[in-house]
């Protein structure tokens, strides 16, 4: 019997925010990851660039909730003479950088063993020798298409066949798996750069700390722009360090993500939530995260609502690594109003329950974590996107070995309800840091 709100938060973490079939899904994912990676490593030109992967997103941060049906994988690309890439901030696009390959090309033009890379670069840079996002992605799209064709658009794991479909979505190359395990993987290419190549402002440079590497992700502009030299910065490793060791921080993030999923607020991306907490890590003393989960949850729900508020000057969510970029800029007023009302109401419900967790208040809190209350009442739908609810995030067990893969057989023959936005329902969206989203419509990731 739950006796107070803190007990309820602990129970919610144990009962509702859990991973089912973790090992089975992880083994299957590892098999697919290894096979795709091996084909990329065999591709002419790309073979010299591919230098490892990083599991990121909810799994990498240990922030995923619910089913293990969505993975984000950075595929690191490192050019010969990579440290000679001249990185400049893109003044026209906050949070983005330009990659000047002039010195790299001057050196490798004289190296016979790097001729395939030089030939590739000649096709994917402009007349200023700046690397072009769309040209690089077009090349990788061809590689991934060939990869799926060679695999017969299927994979066999432990004697069971799963069918694969591929689509390009934002910066990600997404593979949807249908079979005994159904999930999707975003393969996100990322140019791996060193700390010496940072172009951060002094304050943000301080947050980067002792991290050795960061990435430039070929994220398309909105709308798509041909011959685009602008790449989105990504600081996954530095962010992981900033969130590490903050006792109840990750529990609070998981609870907010779970509430978002249950309320079907797919326009609020996981990276939005993560960014709210990154800013709070800078503002709060380390001891703050040792407070009870309920206190952190209530305050963070309030912070989130404040940022979504349509005030005369509008709330905004600055990108942690370049505050000139507002991560809420692409949201419509209806979307913001819908989410503001949702999270402000949740804040009110939790504050009320914290003062008096009677049966009615407990049922209201319960409804925030599940689709129905204790007595089985159906939770009122709070979003016009309720039919597009997307599953949530958690970290796979790193100790699970990749499952053996057999060769593939040949294929057999403020209170207004936001209005539905059909364009939003159809388009692919990505994590605001440029490394996912993920890929269904619209994706909460």
From Swiss-Prot:
Family: Belongs to the mab-21 family.
Cofactor(s) needed by this chain: Mg(2+); Mn(2+)
Keywords, sorted A to Z: Antiviral defense, ATP-binding, GTP-binding, Immunity, Innate immunity, Magnesium, Manganese, Metal-binding, Nucleotide-binding, Nucleotidyltransferase, RNA-binding, Transferase
Binding site for ATP: 70-72, 236-239, 257, 270-274
Activity-regulation annotation: The enzyme activity is specifically activated by double-stranded RNA (dsRNA).
Positions of GTP binding: 186, 232-239
Pfam families: Mab-21, Mab-21_C
Family matches, as PANTHER family: CELL FATE DETERMINING PROTEIN MAB21-RELATED (PTHR10656), CYCLIC GMP-AMP SYNTHASE-LIKE PROTEIN-RELATED (PTHR10656:SF42)
Region annotation Disordered: where it falls in the sequence: 357-445
Entry's EC annotation: 2.7.7.-
Xref: InterPro entries: Mab-21-like_nuc_Trfase (IPR046903), Mab-21_HhH/H2TH-like (IPR046906), MAB21L/cGLR (IPR024810)
MF (Gene Ontology): 2',3'-cyclic GMP-AMP synthase activity; 3',2'-cyclic GMP-AMP synthase activity; ATP binding; double-stranded RNA binding; GTP binding; metal ion binding
Protein's name in the database: Cyclic GMP-AMP synthase-like receptor 1
Catalyzed reactions: GTP + ATP = 3',2'-cGAMP + 2 diphosphate; GTP + ATP = pppA(2'-5')pG + diphosphate; pppA(2'-5')pG = 3',2'-cGAMP + diphosphate
Biased composition (Basic and acidic residues): 377-398
Statement: the UniProt record of this protein carries the keyword ATP-binding: yes
Sequence positions that bind Mg(2+): 70, 72, 186
Biased composition regions of type Low complexity, renumbered to the chain: 435-445
BP GO annotations: cellular response to virus; cGAS/STING signaling pathway; defense response to virus; immune response involved in response to exogenous dsRNA; innate immune response
Domain of life: Eukaryota
Function: Nucleotidyltransferase that catalyzes the formation of cyclic GMP-AMP (3',2'-cGAMP) from ATP and GTP and plays a key role in innate immunity. Synthesizes 3',2'-cGAMP in a two-step reaction through production of the linear intermediate pppA(2'-5')pG. Acts as a key sensor of double-stranded RNA (dsRNA), the presence of dsRNA in the cytoplasm being a danger signal that triggers the immune responses.
């Amino acid at each position: 019997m739950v006796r107070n709100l803190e007990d309820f938060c602990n129970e919610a973490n144990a009962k509702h925010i859990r991973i089912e079939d973790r090992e089975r899904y992880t083994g299957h994912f590892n098999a697919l990851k290894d096979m795709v990676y091996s084909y990329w490593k065999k591709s002419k030109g790309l073979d010299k660039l591919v230098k490892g992967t990083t599991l990121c997103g909810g799994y990498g941060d240990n922030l995923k909730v619910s089913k293990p049906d969505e993975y984000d994988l950075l595929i690191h690309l490192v050019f010969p003479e990579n440290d000679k890439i001249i990185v400049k901030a893109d003044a026209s696009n906050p949070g983005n950088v330009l990659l000047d390959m002039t010195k790299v090309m001057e050196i490798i033009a004289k190296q016979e063993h790097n001729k395939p890379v030089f030939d590739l670069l000649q096709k994917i840079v402009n007349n200023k020798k700046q690397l072009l996002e769309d040209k690089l992605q077009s090349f990788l799209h061809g590689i991934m298409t060939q990869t799926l064709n060679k695999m017969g658009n299927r994979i066999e794991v432990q004697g069971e066949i799963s069918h694969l479909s591929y689509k390009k979505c934002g910066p990600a190359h997404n593979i949807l798996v249908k079979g005994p395990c159904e999930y999707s993987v975003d393969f996100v290419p990322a140019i791996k750069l060193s700390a010496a190549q940072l172009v951060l402002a002094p304050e943000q440079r301080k947050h980067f700390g002792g991290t050795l590497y960061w990435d430039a992700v070929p994220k398309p502009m909105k709308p798509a722009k041909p011959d685009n030299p602008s790449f989105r910065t990504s600081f996954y490793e530095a962010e992981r360090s900033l969130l590490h060791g903050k006792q109840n921080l990750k529990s609070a993030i998981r609870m907010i993500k779970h509430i978002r999923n249950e309320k079907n607020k797919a326009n609020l991306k996981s990276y939005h939530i993560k960014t709210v907490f990154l800013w709070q890590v800078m503002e709060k003393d380390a001891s703050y995260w040792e407070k009870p989960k309920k206190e952190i949850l209530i305050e963070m729900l309030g912070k989130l609502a404040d940022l979504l508020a349509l005030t005369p000057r509008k709330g905004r969510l600055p990108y942690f690594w370049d505050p000139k970029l507002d991560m809420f800029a692409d949201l419509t007023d209806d979307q913001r109003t819908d989410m503001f009302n949702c999270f402000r109401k949740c804040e009110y419900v939790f504050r009320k329950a914290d003062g008096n967790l009677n049966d009615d208040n407990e049922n209201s809190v319960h409804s925030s974590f599940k689709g129905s209350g204790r007595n089985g009442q159906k939770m009122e739908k709070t979003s016009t996107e309720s039919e597009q609810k997307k599953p949530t995030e958690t970290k796979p067990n790193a100790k699970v070995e990749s499952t053996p893969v057999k060769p593939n057989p040949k294929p057999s023959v403020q209170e207004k309800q936001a209005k539905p936005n059909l364009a939003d329902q159809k388009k692919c969206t990505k994590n605001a840091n440029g490394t996912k989203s993920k890929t269904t419509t619209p994706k909460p990731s």
